[in-house]
Amino acid sequence: GNFVIGYWLRGPLRAGGEIVAGFMGKYYDMLMEDVRMHEGMKACMNCGVCTAVCPAAEFYNYDPRQIVSTVQTQDDEAIEALLRSETIWYCGECMSCRPRCPRGNTPGYVVQALRNLSQKLGFFTESEKGRQQFALKRLIGENILRTGYCITPRLVNPDMHPEQGPVWKWVYDNDREVFGRFNPTYMQEGPGAMRRIDERSLEELRRIFEETGGMEFFDS
């Protein structure tokens, strides 16, 4: 077989990860290796309840019902189109779809699996919202590994975020006084929110990333 971004496939591949005719369902097989798919897609009957309650569907041309229906076909061409599209990045992962599906599907999990595969195969770079994952990795992912937080007040620099206005600039310049009223250990070691995370805890966090494959995914 051929080895492509962590997957052994039975059959030849063209450049760019596209699968030749006659090897139907290989993208589907890749998706089914994601544990989220087993709970996310059981048996969609196209009722449309997920789309009706989806907040993202109110703002985008987005139909989670159609995404699940497409994946169910196991059609490589259709699934690849999803992997390269903007569509899979519209979901806010609120999981409103999860408790409402009469067949027990969770379209949000299917979208998560599609996003994961799109990133592993490099297809995410072909959509604007997909490419925004680079910014999220730098702005949030690296913050987690460095500080233990997704974001802290000191990371929202007014020079980089002028939309925050003059009030935020004042808060930023006086952050210890402002946030110190809520927690005396603000950005210091000790208990409480917004404390400085000690190095031992940060090392444990990094080890979790390494053991779960997160670090390899970050560096790929």
Task: Please state what every model-predicted region is.
Residues 5, 138-141, 209:
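Short, Φ-rich (hydrophobic/aromatic) sequence segments
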Residues 21-35, 59-90, 94, 104-170:
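Ferredoxin-type iron-sulfur electron-transfer modules in oxidoreductases and energy-metabolism complexes
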Residues 40-59, 88-105:
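Local cysteine-cluster metal-coordination motifs and their immediate loop/turn environment
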Residues 167-220:
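C-terminal, charged low-complexity interaction regions
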